[in-house]
Regions:
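C-terminal catalytic histidine-bearing segment of alpha/beta-hydrolase fold enzymes
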Residues: 32, 217-219, 228-286
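Mobile cap/lid helix-loop segments that gate and shape the active-site cleft of serine hydrolases
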Residues: 8, 168-206
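A fold-wide structural signal in alpha/beta-hydrolase
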Residues: 44, 69-79, 119
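N-terminal cap/lid segment of alpha/beta-hydrolase-fold proteins
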Residues: 1-39
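Acidic catalytic loop of the alpha/beta-hydrolase fold
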Residues: 166, 223-228
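Primarily recognizes the serine-hydrolase "nucleophile elbow" in alpha/beta-hydrolase
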Residues: 102-173
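Catalytic nucleophile-loop/oxyanion-hole region of alpha/beta-hydrolase
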Residues: 57-64, 76-115, 264-271
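Short beta-strand element of the alpha/beta-hydrolase
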Residues: 41-51
Length: 286
C-alpha cells in the first residue's frame, strides 16, 4: 500500500494506492482510495472501471478521484475479476463490488469516511456491475455469506454509458462480432442456454419499488455506437421512474463512448460538462 499526497491548484488530496479490499479465488483484489484533506468523515463512492467485463484498470479514475476529493468526496477505485473465454465472472464481479463496499464501511474510521454515506459509480461494463451491486444486493445469486456491510443499502448509484439490459447488449454483440461476445464471456452462457442468468445479470430487473430509496444519476452520449442509448440508458431510466426512483440524467450531445477517462478540466470536455451536474446530484443525495 502506498500513501501519497497530490497537490492541486487549491488544495491537496490523499491517495492510498494499492489497498487490498478482499481476496477471492486466491487473488488479492486492490483499490486506490482518493481522500480529501481534513478531519472528515467524508462520503465515498466505490468506482468500477469499464472494459467490456474482460479488460480495463482502476486507473481509469485518475482524473475523477482527485476531482471528487477536492470537492469533499472519497473515491475508492477498484480492480475486480475480469472474464476470459471459459472463465466467467458473473456473479463474481458483483460480489467483488459488494466486498469493496464492506471494506470502506469497515475501514471508515481509519480513512475518515462516513460509512453511512456510501455510493457506487461505474462506467460501461462497470456501470452494469455497480448497478447490480446497488439494486440487486439482496438477490439470492449475490448472497452467500460475507460481512453484513456487503448487503446494506447504498445511498446513490452513478452510471455512465452503462449496460442495464444484458440480453439487449448480447443482441448488439451478435450483430457486430458474434465470435467475440463479451456478454457470453461474462455470464458463461448464451441466452438460449440460460435465460434466467440474463435476467439476473440485468440491473433493469431490479428497478423495483422496494429499491427506490437509492438516488440514481445516469449519463450517456447521443452518439454512442457501442452501447445503445435507447435500449440501455433510456429503457433503464423509464423503469426507474416507473418504480418511483429519484433520477437525474446528463445527456451529452455529440458524445460517443469512452470519454469518461478524459481530463475533467480540459476545455469543452465531456467529463467537464458532467462534473458540476454530478456534484449537484451528490450534494443532494449523498
Amino acid at each position: 500500500m502506498t500513501s501519497l499526497s497530490q497537490t492541486g491548484e487549491k488544495d491537496e488530496i490523499d491517495l492510498r494506492a494499492g489497498l487490498t479490499y478482499a481476496t477471492h479465488d486466491g487473488v488479492a483484489l486492490l483499490g486506490d482510495l482518493y481522500l480529501p484533506k481534513g478531519a472528515g468523515p467524508f462520503p465515498v463512492l466505490v468506482a468500477l472501471h469499464g472494459g467490456g467485463w474482460v479488460q480495463g484498470a482502476r486507473n481509469a479514475f485518475q482524473h475523477w478521484g482527485p476531482h471528487l476529493a477536492r470537492h469533499g468526496y472519497g473515491l475508492f477505485a477498484i480492480s475486480y475479476r475480469l472474464a476470459k473465454t471459459g472463465q466467467k465472472t458473473f456473479p463474481h464481479a458483483v460480489k467483488d463490488a459488494l466486498a469493496a463496499i464492506a471494506f470502506v464501511r469497515a475501514s471508515a474510521r481509519e480513512y475518515r469516511l462516513d460509512g453511512e454515506r456510501v455510493g457506487l459509480l461505474g462506467a460501461s461494463a462497470g456501470a452494469n456491475i455497480a448497478a447490480l451491486a446497488a439494486l440487486g444486493r439482496e438477490a439470492a445469486i449475490f448472497a452467500g455469506g460475507g460481512a453484513p456491510e456487503m448487503h446494506a443499502p447504498v445511498k446513490v448509484l452513478v452510471g455512465v454509458y452503462g449496460v442495464y439490459d444484458v440480453l439487449a447488449m448480447w443482441q448488439r454483440y451478435q450483430e457486430a462480432s458474434p465470435r467475440e461476445n463479451n456478454i457470453e464471456k461474462f455470464i458463461g452462457a448464451a441466452p438460449m442456454e440460460n435465460r434466467q442468468l440474463y435476467f439476473d445479470a440485468s440491473p433493469i430487473s431490479y428497478a423495483s419499488i422496494a429499491n427506490n430509496k437509492i438516488g440514481v444519476f445516469l449519463a450517456c452520449g447521443t452518439e454512442d455506437d457501442l452501447v445503445d442509448r435507447r435500449t440501455q440508458t433510456d429503457a433503464f431510466l423509464l423503469a426507474l421512474k416507473q418504480a418511483g426512483f429519484f433520477v437525474r440524467t446528463c445527456i451529452l450531445a455529440g458524445a460517443g463512448h469512452y470519454w469518461m477517462n478524459d481530463p475533467i478540466d480540459e476545455p469543452t470536455s465531456y467529463p467537464g460538462f458532467m462534473a458540476p451536474r454530478l456534484l449537484r446530484f451528490l450534494a443532494e443525495k449523498l
